[in-house]
Structure formats: structure tokens, C-alpha cells
Design a protein with these regions (language model features):
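Outer-membrane beta-barrel translocator domains and adjoining extracellular loop/strand segments
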Residues: 44-48, 78-82, 105-113, 148-155, ...
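Cleavable N-terminal export/targeting peptides
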Residues: 1-29
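Transmembrane beta-strand segments that form the barrel wall of outer-membrane beta-barrel proteins
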Residues: 34-40, 63-74, 94-102, 109-111, ...
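Detector for outer-membrane/organellar transmembrane beta-barrel domains
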Residues: 113-186
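Outer-membrane beta-barrel "beta-signal"
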Residues: 202, 206-208, 228-240
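Short loop/turn motifs that connect adjacent beta-strands in outer-membrane beta-barrel proteins
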Residues: 22-29, 95, 130-135, 167-175, ...
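Residues that define the transmembrane beta-barrel architecture of outer-membrane proteins
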Residues: 28, 49-53, 60, 77-81, ...
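Short glycine/proline- and aromatic-enriched beta-strand/turn motifs that initiate or cap beta-hairpins
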Residues: 22-73
Length: 240
């Protein structure tokens, strides 16, 4: 389940690639990247303890963005394939993402089993406002289709909201602070509780310099007050 991760990755890589460019070329709408992370954290939820690889390809033109992204733990404990489309106009972005978790065996996660009662897909709609004069972002998202079900098989429409503040000290030294909460009983609290803060995140991003080459890196402290857990992760980013 990867939305903001992809946006951060593209931002870090675009900065690094610009610094490494030796001549001005027409920018391609296609991109490819790879993130290596010490563990997979998303919206305050730990998806495993093993280092995880996130490959991504994307297409971006005139405000339209499409991507395919994967998440693979090196110990084989987690696999994920995400597809998404979004459109940005001025300060607003709306999009839909499909999250899919393949396993080596099993029938419920067959990719083309798309019946809402049986599918293994999780489909989410979201909207984001990113301020230009006010340095904030606000995201609201809801699972609208798929495996986000309660024990009775009913759609939970698990919803999440996040407010964040980015700050740049220099071109290669940035911090982002955010607070996120689930808005109803659902996925983020195992259908046990309504509104709760589930994600407090502080992420510092910089670049390691090797001559003319810059390697984007980040470090994150994550606190989930609802689960009473905290985590620390680091990531490296590569443009292909």
C-alpha cells in the first residue's frame, strides 16, 4: 500500500538526477526507480521486520500520473503489487490505487478474481491538497472496493486522513512531519475502534555525495499511538 512513498521517491530522485546530469535533455514522461528500506512501514503499520525492496515505474504528463510499484521483503515474508492513476490540477490531486498481495498458493488472491466478495484486491480512492503558499499537505483516503471486509463480509470503507508539514533547510536537507488517523472502524485498528491517531511520522531526507554523484537517503521515526509501538527505518533511493 504505497502512495506517498512513490511521491517522495520521485522527488528525491529528480533532485539527484538533476545534479548528476551532464547535458540538458528533453525530460521523458517515463521514470523508473528502486528503493531499499530497512523495513516496510506504511501509515504507522509494520508490514514485516525484513529489509524490503520497492521497484517502481511511472508515467507522468500534463498532470496525469500512472504507476506500477512492487514491495518485496528479502526473506520472502511479503509480496505486493500496486497500480495507480491520479490527476493533479493546481494544488489538488485525486487518484485511485489498487493494492494486491500475491502468495505462492491460495485461491483468494488470484489476480483476475474481481468479484467484490472474493477478490484479494484492495482498491482505494484518495484526494490530496498540497499547499503552495501554506506549506502543508492534507490527504483523505477510503477503501471503496475489495478485500477491506469485516468478519461478516461487509465492506468496511476503512478511511484515513493525514496532515503533513514539509520543510527544506537546503536543497539536499529536508524534513517532513505528519500526523495520520483512521476515521472509522476498519483496517487500521483491526475493526476494533473508531477514530484514533495511528501514525506520527518524522522523516529526514538528504543525499550522500560521491564526487558528482548524489545518493538520496532518508531516515524516519514512526510512532503508532493506537498500537503503542514505535519504529525507526532508513531508505536508499536509486533512479534507473
Amino acid at each position: 500500500m504505497i502512495i506517498n512513498r512513490g511521491k517522495l521517491l520521485l522527488l528525491l530522485l529528480s533532485t539527484a538526477m538533476a545534479a548528476n546530469a551532464e547535458e540538458n535533455l528533453k525530460e521523458s514522461p517515463f521514470s523508473a526507480s528502486l528503493e531499499l528500506s530497512t523495513k516496510y512501514m506504511w501509515r504507522g503499520i509494520e508490514y514485516g521486520t525484513a529489509p524490503t525492496v520497492f521497484p517502481m515505474i511511472g508515467y507522468n504528463t500534463h498532470g496525469f500520473n500512472a504507476f506500477a510499484m512492487g514491495g518485496y521483503a528479502i526473506d520472502g515474508s511479503h509480496q505486493e503489487v500496486d497500480l495507480g492513476v491520479s490527476y493533479t490540477a493546481s494544488e489538488f490531486t485525486v487518484g485511485v490505487s489498487d493494492y494486491y498481495y500475491p502468495s505462492s498458493v491460495g485461491e483468494k488472491d488470484q489476480y483476475f478474481k474481481l468479484n467484490n466478495r472474493e477478490t484479494g484486491h484492495w482498491v482505494e480512492a484518495y484526494a490530496t491538497w498540497t499547499g503552495t503558499k501554506v506549506p502543508l499537505w492534507v490527504t483523505v483516503s477510503t477503501y471503496i472496493f475489495g478485500a477491506d471486509k469485516n468478519v461478516d463480509g461487509k465492506q468496511m470503507y476503512s478511511s484515513y486522513a493525514e496532515v503533513g508539514y514539509p520543510h527544506s533547510f537546503t536543497e539536499d536537507n529536508n524534513i517532513a512531519l505528519c500526523v495520520g488517523a483512521n476515521l472509522n472502524k476498519g483496517f487500521y485498528t483491526n475493526n476494533q475502534s473508531g477514530f484514533n491517531v495511528v501514525n506520527i511520522n518524522a522523516k529526514y531526507s538528504t543525499a550522500l555525495k560521491f564526487g558528482n554523484f548524489k545518493l538520496p537517503v532518508s531516515a524516519s521515526y514512526v510512532l503508532n499511538p493506537y498500537n503503542n509501538k514505535s519504529y525507526f527505518t532508513m531508505s536508499l533511493y536509486f533512479g534507473l
